[in-house]
């Protein structure tokens, strides 16, 4: 999360229009689920974190980040708040649950509705992940289309990445993580568009 990437090239940036704000996601995820595992360790999910993300964008603007054991991020000096893309779910974070569980499937519906209101009414650019607008029930898992030996390397790398989370550290759970190269992993991640008609209450929100 480097704020300077939003600056024009003559100021050392890449002239980007917007950037993910993982800090908002992480703070919200901890607030909703109470989970502070893996790279969520440095977040408390308190109201002040969420307010700071709405006011300033990145929470980490050069402070020490315990999980990475080094400073994280840089300031967003002079950048408009809408340059931060805020989200409760995206392809990375849903897939990083290992089994591809969507946030609304394991947190309080009341809290999830409140978090959605904060997301949509905040000054940043909100992102709704595929199917989030109608509470899609399908999982979204990490998938890739590689030939051997890269396919096995990616699968093993995925297991190693997930070991940072205590809930995925056991061998039994590791074995349950879907193979990214299996076509079924991709197919199970596709939306059931009929849910738009079945979940009309979610669309009304």
Q: Where does each model-flagged region fall?
A:
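Conserved alpha/beta catalytic core and glycan-binding cleft of carbohydrate-active enzymes
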Residues: 1-171, 183-186
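Aromatic- and carboxylate-lined catalytic core of secreted/periplasmic carbohydrate-active enzymes
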Residues: 176-205
């Amino acid at each position: 999360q480097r704020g300077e990437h939003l600056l024009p090239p003559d100021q050392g940036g890449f002239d980007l229009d917007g950037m993910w704000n993982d800090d908002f996601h992480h703070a919200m995820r901890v607030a909703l689920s109470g989970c502070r595992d893996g790279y969520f360790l440095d977040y408390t999910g308190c109201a002040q974190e969420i307010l700071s993300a709405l006011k300033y964008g990145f929470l980490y603007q050069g402070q020490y980040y315990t999980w990475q054991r080094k400073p994280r991020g840089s300031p967003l000096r002079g950048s408009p708040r809408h340059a931060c893309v805020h989200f409760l779910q995206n392809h990375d974070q849903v897939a990083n649950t290992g089994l591809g569980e969507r946030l609304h499937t394991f947190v309080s519906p009341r809290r999830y509705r409140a978090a959605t209101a904060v997301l949509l009414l905040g000054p940043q650019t909100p992102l709704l992940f595929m199917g989030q607008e109608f509470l899609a029930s399908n999982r979204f898992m990490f998938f890739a289309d590689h030939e051997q030996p890269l396919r096995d390397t990616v699968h093993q790398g995925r297991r190693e990445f997930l070991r940072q989370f205590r809930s995925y550290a056991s061998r039994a759970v590791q074995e349950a993580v879907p193979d990214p190269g299996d076509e079924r992993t991709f197919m199970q991640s596709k939306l059931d568009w009929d849910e738009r008609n079945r979940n009309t209450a979610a669309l009304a929100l």
